[in-house]
Amino acid sequence: MGGMSWIHWVIVIAVVALLFGGRGKLSGIMGDAAKGIKAFKDGLKDDSSDEVSANKATGALPRTEAEKEDLRKS
């Protein structure tokens, strides 16, 4: 509990290497992470817009008999 085992030192060295090594700046790493998140969100947005356009195309026709009866009553 008082001392650090070898696995703790490996983790500490990995974190230090990530922060100060690698690309040289933490901001560069965070910038890359932000670009990845933005690309992921854009991909989700593109998928949802495709679904919306598909729903609009099929949404013009009633899908069930109950919807057809509702339209007839109106």
From Swiss-Prot:
The chain crosses the membrane at residues 1-21. Residues 43-74 are annotated as: Disordered. GO terms for cellular component: TAT protein transport complex. Its main location: membrane. It comes from the Bacteria. Residues 64-74 have a biased composition (Basic and acidic residues). It is a single-pass membrane protein. It is found in: Cell inner membrane. HAMAP family: TatA_E. Part of the twin-arginine translocation (Tat) system that transports large folded proteins containing a characteristic twin-arginine motif in their signal peptide across membranes. TatA could form the protein-conducting channel of the Tat system. This is Sec-independent protein translocase protein TatA. The lineage of its organism: Bacteria, Pseudomonadati, Pseudomonadota, Alphaproteobacteria, Caulobacterales.
